Amino acid sequence: QDCIVHPNSVLGSDGFGFAPENESYQKIEQLGGLEIGDNVEIGAGCTIDRGAISNTMIFDGVKLDNQIHIAHNVSLGSNSAIAANCAIAGSTKIGKNFKMGGLSGVLGHLEICDDVTIGAHTLITKSIKSSGNYIGIMPAQNHMNWSKSAVFIKKRGK
């Protein structure tokens, strides 16, 4: 009820489900659906996959900017807002009041608690169990410099 879906968005498409078999891939039938709550706005060019087994869930009050991908079996909590060009991989469970800056991503099968803000261009690689602000921007540089920086940062964090 009271939802807005902008042009060229695809709702309920099959998730990316394939099983390797004899040096090729066999499509895994997607049996779930997609449920969208009230007062949701979905920007232009978004794709939201239906669930593989259970439903993909977009709860009340969610606001999605343009060109966002939400994969199969994701649960996106109420009153969440996601900026353009973000992706959330399959089977991720996200609490309410989630905010995600542009060009960010969340890996699959993670859980993110309520009241989490993700800064722009951040990749979430593990579950988040404490509310707060998270960011992980690292500007582009040649591979050798990046490798040295990554080792330095890891050592400093211990």
Where are these regions (language model features)?
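Long, leucine- and charge-enriched amphipathic alpha-helices
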Residues: 145-158
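Structural signal for interior beta-strand "rungs" in well-ordered beta-sheet cores
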Residues: 3-142
